[in-house]
Regions:
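Alpha-helical segment of the N-proximal tetratricopeptide repeat
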Residues: 8-39, 56-59, 87
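TPR alpha-solenoid repeat register
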Residues: 46, 81, 115, 148, ...
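Eukaryotic alpha-helical solenoid repeat scaffolds
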Residues: 144-321
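Canonical tetratricopeptide repeat
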Residues: 49-52, 83-84, 118, 151, ...
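Structural motif corresponding to the intra-repeat A-B loop/turn of tetratricopeptide repeats
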Residues: 23, 57, 92, 125-126, ...
Length: 321
């Protein structure tokens, strides 16, 4: 068989296997990928897919046997291969091996958000407080990867650090906008704003806050005359509008921040009320939100189209924690 014909065969096998995997038929996917792997035993992509297919059938040792030769050879693996291997080690009940692997992988791939996320989740499962440091490092090194924001926002929610829960939670729902995790964090965001403004003077205790945090609190502290009306989508729209105008005037040049730029962009497009309804409406009152979208259908549709045209990415160098 010519190399070209063999490549065609391998590509077709992979395509068929992916179709089976998409339908949850991992047994057939494994059967096909095994044949593809026999044809190209050095093909990392096939190895990753075969290992994952074994893993999804609860055959973790077979999954490890496939992927381990690649991670043992530093030049053969990518960050995804390390992620797969780390997940398998955890399933096999070998956390020390997993931790050793994650540390090595992060050294080799320091900008891989997925590695930090998985390592942090493993530490969290072991009740290790270092987990948040790992997620924070992931946010710093790979700022457009969503899951580190998700885990950090939930961590800060339970630790009652509402400032960072608010910021990281909203960044996350703009990176990952239409999943169950999105809905979960929308609920957390609304509750965090209520808890955040439960303190009448946000600058009362800032001894351990950095300059960026104090700037944020200073701008938010000026919105107390709106807060006394209660926290709901309408008052949050007003609070956040005034915040952005104040931030733009006083701090935007010193602290460029993608989330605030996005909010300003929506303000200028006249879509900020719809955006705030999208975040807070259903969490506050589903019936009221449905009523709002019914009465503002063109605005709601325009926001959806506008957001669909945006891939929310956070630039490097905007890390202030």
């Amino acid at each position: 068989m010519s190399l070209f014909a063999q490549q065609e065969d391998v590509d077709k096998l992979q395509e068929n296997a992916r179709t089976f995997m998409q339908h949850g038929d991992y047994a057939n996917a494994t059967l096909i990928l095994t044949r593809a792997f026999q044809l190209e035993p050095q093909n990392l992509q096939i190895a990753k897919e075969l290992s994952l297919s074994y893993f999804l059938q609860n055959e973790s040792q077979k999954a490890m046997d496939v992927i381990k030769p690649f991670i043992d050879n530093t030049n053969s693996a990518d960050d995804q291969a390390y992620q797969i291997a780390g997940t398998i080690y955890r399933k096999l009940g070998q956390p020390k091996d997993a931790e050793k692997l994650y540390k090595k992988a992060i050294k080799d791939f320091p900008n891989s958000g997925g590695l930090y996320n998985d390592y942090g989740e493993m530490l969290l499962a072991a009740h290790d407080p270092e987990s948040i440091k790992i997620w924070e490092k992931g946010i710093q090194m790979d700022p457009s990867f969503g899951s580190n924001y998700y885990n950090a926002a939930k961590y800060y929610y339970y630790k009652k650090d509402n400032l960072w829960c608010i910021l990281y939670g909203e960044i996350f729902i703009n990176i990952e906008s239409f999943t169950a995790r999105t809905a979960e964090l929308k609920d957390i965001l609304l509750d965090s704003y209520k808890r955040f403004f439960a303190t009448p003077d946000l600058l009362q205790n800032v001894k351990n806050r950095n300059d960026f945090e104090i700037a944020f609190l200073t701008c938010m502290n000026k919105q107390n005359d709106v807060v006394i009306r209660g926290i709901n989508p309408e008052t949050l729209t007003m609070i956040r509008t005034r915040f952005i105008l104040e931030w733009d005037k006083s701090y935007a040049a010193k602290y460029p921040f993608r989330l605030f730029n996005w909010q300003e962009q929506l303000l200028q497009a006249g879509l900020f009320p719809a955006y705030n309804q999208w975040i807070f409406g259903a969490s506050q009152n589903l019936a009221a939100y449905q009523n709002w979208t019914g009465n503002h259908s063109s605005e709601a549709d325009e926001f959806k189209q506008f957001k669909a045209g945006i891939i929310f990415k956070v630039p490097q160098g905007q890390y202030y924690h």
